[in-house]
A protein has these predicted regions:
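Flexible, low-complexity segments
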Residues: 138-192
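Alpha/beta catalytic cores of group-transfer enzymes, especially the acyltransferase/condensing modules
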Residues: 1-143, 172
Length: 192
């Protein structure tokens, strides 16, 4: 069932071909969010990923991405990097994908989770099947608040961060936000 969902989500998201994503390093997320509002007349652009205190990813239409990138440099960003991605993920431009995925998720048989799942909003702990369905759809157009997720987990008493990945992508971001956590990478070759 999980593989079918991943395939359906990917298929729905691949249909949205307008727009992209840009990483902004050296400015805090609130500043980047303000800059997005300042360039709104050029097109849709919004914060897509709150990765670390000074790394934020924006998503939107190309003209607006260019405008927010230029303004970010003027306001002191250390780097602005256009990401090599196929769409404007975690933005309102993905609404057609969210609607298509909602149709798939509505018939999904889910049970109440024994272990709560932390939502992309960084604060909501989900167990109810209806809440999980709504969150699965919302995360297609909504931002990933990774920094908030880490803060929430630390407040809950989490002391170790385990990344399951061929290479360490999240650990460097997590370390910037929560340096006191213990970090472990589990890759194809075992624990690193």
């Amino acid at each position: 069932e999980g593989v079918r969902l991943v395939q359906a989500r990917g298929q729905a998201m691949s249909q949205v071909k307008t727009g992209g994503m840009t990483a902004i390093l050296g400015l805090d997320g609130q500043t980047v969010e303000t800059l997005c509002a300042e360039v709104a007349s050029t097109g849709l652009v919004q914060v897509a990923n709150w990765n670390s205190p000074f790394q934020t990813v924006v998503s939107g239409e190309f003209r607006a991405l260019e405008a927010v990138g230029t303004l970010s440099k003027e306001r002191g960003a250390k780097r602005v990097v256009q990401l090599n991605v196929s769409g404007p993920f975690h933005s309102r431009l993905m609404e057609p994908a969210a609607q298509a995925f909602a149709e798939v998720v509505q018939d999904l048989e889910l049970r109440v989770c024994h272990t709560p799942v932390l939502s992309n909003d960084g604060q909501s702990m989900l167990q109810d099947p209806g809440d999980i369905r709504r969150s699965m759809v919302r995360q297609i157009t909504g931002p990933v608040r990774f920094t908030d997720q880490l803060h929430t987990l630390v407040r809950m008493g989490v002391t170790e961060f385990v990344e399951l990945s061929p290479e360490s992508l999240l650990i460097p971001l997590a370390r910037r936000s929560q340096p006191n956590l213990q970090f472990t990478l589990v890759s194809d070759g075992g624990m690193v």
